[in-house]
């Protein structure tokens, strides 16, 4: 049972300085236009800082003031999105919700079997089809929840229409640094995305249509499990330098293929799609603080007859990453078209949030106990995150409920509902 929560207040946080007239209209890029209309949900859980004298009211006020300051630099986030074309940077403000949770932090996060219970720590729904209406024109919303023990949860919804996860990391790093009182922060660049990928008039905005009967599980691959997978892959190949993400994706892909073959038979190729950051792949490279959806989709595939173990899948994954394409707009368009044409059971897509430093986000009262997302309503769309120790991988995997039950025990044994570890 989810902890009882009481909403205390909601207000709009405005930038501390008005946005100049010259910056009132922010044109989104063509890559932004091709992205789904939804939000990136992200939650940070913090234990009670033993050396802090701040009460909830002071903490909330401190967060609001620092958010107001940082919004001066991230001014589109305080505006309102015009349908698939631009952001009206009118300083309408960021919704900021404050709530009280009638539970200890440890009680709330030690046994989260149903991951949708995490949704209550978000300011609003991240995806359409839920019980709460999605505010599609609001770029950013924030919620802080105070537990009885003094712990906190900070939930953020950032519109995927104007930002990718690296943009989220850039914003959160700037906000936490400002909250700590630092005067030098990494300033965002909102010009580069549209300059390199100019918007195209009348581009339709893809809608996210939730799948039915989808269940999501959080699989935790700790250091020991990663080591075992690496040893198995090394024994089957002369290559030894496998990344954590490659090992986990190949391992999951192999079992998804097995489930698909058992349920549907082998008809077409099995495809994996990975979202890849373009900033470092551009010529010249773009800085990491360039805001927007500066990413593309890369594909790897094996024939329907493929029937080997997971190390054999690492090669196709690596080969797809080595591909280069000058026309990234065309590359992404081709990828989006392919996504719509494939049958869901033939496809595994994944995004990696690893190595983005989310466990270093310190508002001034210490690092988080847990950094997580929440459920996603599309089957076979995996999200990978670092474990708190930094040497493991969390795989958040949504599947059709009956297909999830068909996964082998060796994979299902990695399901972990304890977010306090």
UniProtKB/Swiss-Prot annotation:
InterPro entries: CAT-like_dom_sf (IPR023213). The active site is at residues 160, 362. It comes from the Eukaryota. Optimum temperature is 35 degrees Celsius. Its EC number is 2.3.1.160. It is an enzyme of class 2 (transferase). Monomer. This is Vinorine synthase. It comes from Rauvolfia serpentina.
């Amino acid at each position: 049972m989810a902890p009882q929560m009481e909403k205390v207040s909601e207000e709009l946080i405005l930038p501390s300085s008005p946005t100049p007239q010259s910056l009132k209209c922010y044109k989104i890029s063509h890559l932004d236009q091709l992205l789904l209309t939804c939000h990136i949900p992200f939650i940070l859980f913090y234990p009670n800082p033993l050396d802090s004298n701040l009460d909830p009211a002071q903490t909330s006020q401190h967060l609001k003031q620092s958010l107001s300051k940082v919004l001066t630099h991230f001014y589109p986030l305080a505006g309102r999105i015009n349908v698939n074309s631009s952001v009206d940077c009118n300083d309408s403000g960021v919704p900021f919700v404050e709530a009280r949770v009638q539970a200890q932090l440890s009680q709330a996060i030690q046994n989260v079997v149903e991951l949708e219970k995490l949704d209550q720590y978000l300011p609003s729904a991240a995806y359409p089809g839920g019980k709460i209406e999605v505010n599609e024109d609001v770029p950013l919303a924030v919620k802080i929840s105070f537990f009885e023990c003094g712990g906190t949860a900070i939930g953020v919804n950032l519109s995927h229409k104007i930002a990718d996860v690296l943009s989220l990391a850039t914003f959160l790093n700037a906000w936490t640094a400002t909250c700590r009182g630092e005067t030098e922060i990494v300033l965002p660049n909102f010009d580069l995305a549209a300059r390199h990928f100019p918007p195209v008039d009348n581009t339709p905005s893809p809608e996210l249509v939730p799948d039915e009967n989808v269940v999501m599980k959080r699989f935790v691959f700790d250091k020991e499990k990663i080591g075992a997978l690496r040893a198995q892959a090394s024994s089957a190949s002369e290559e030894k330098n496998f990344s954590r993400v490659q090992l986990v994706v190949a391992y999951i892909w192999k079992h998804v293929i097995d489930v698909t073959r058992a349920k549907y038979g082998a008809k077409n190729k099995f495809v994996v799609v990975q979202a890849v950051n373009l900033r470092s792949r551009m010529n010249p490279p773009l800085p990491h603080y360039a805001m927007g959806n500066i990413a593309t989709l890369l594909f790897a595939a094996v024939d329907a007859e493929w029937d080997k173990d997971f190390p054999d899948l690492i090669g196709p994954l690596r080969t797809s990453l080595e591909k280069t394409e000058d026309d990234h707009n065309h590359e992404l368009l081709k990828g989006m078209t392919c996504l719509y044409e494939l049958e869901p059971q033939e496809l595994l897509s994944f995004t990696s949030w690893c190595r983005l430093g989310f466990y270093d986000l310190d508002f001034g009262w210490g690092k988080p106990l847990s950094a997580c997302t929440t459920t996603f309503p599309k089957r076979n769309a995996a999200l990978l995150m670092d474990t708190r120790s930094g040497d493991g991988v969390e795989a958040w995997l949504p599947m059709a409920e009956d297909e999830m039950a068909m996964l082998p025990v060796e994979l299902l044994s990695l399901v972990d509902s304890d977010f306090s570890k």
